[in-house]
């Protein structure tokens, strides 16, 4: 989660205002610019969204292969490495595509922690699940240990994500 928060802050602040993981944000920016007639900006959002979709699609098939997880992890590492190696500027959209593709694979690889469904690249679902666990902890007296564990898991994930955002934002002048 730390890496996901850091990567979204990095791409938003240094790679043209595009999110690597939060495709909801990219969809919002895409359609806002479409409605406002800013057609020259649409490519940077749509390419990231398409790359994310292709990453989800490819992981569906890769996981069925022998050694599929190793292949997926290798793709993530290679795509992150190449994405960071691309100079800032006109090719930001290519770096963002690589990051979005890799993030999609990451999202597909890690779906649960200790039987709790998680999103490892974004916070909205984890925040919802945290509040559900807090509510259930208060109302469901018989299963408090289970909900306490959920509170710890979701709080840790959210804290890691926002810490990644904070670190990149604080270091942005040095990157």
Regions found by a protein language model. Name each.
Residues 1-175:
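Alpha-helical transmembrane segments of multi-pass membrane proteins
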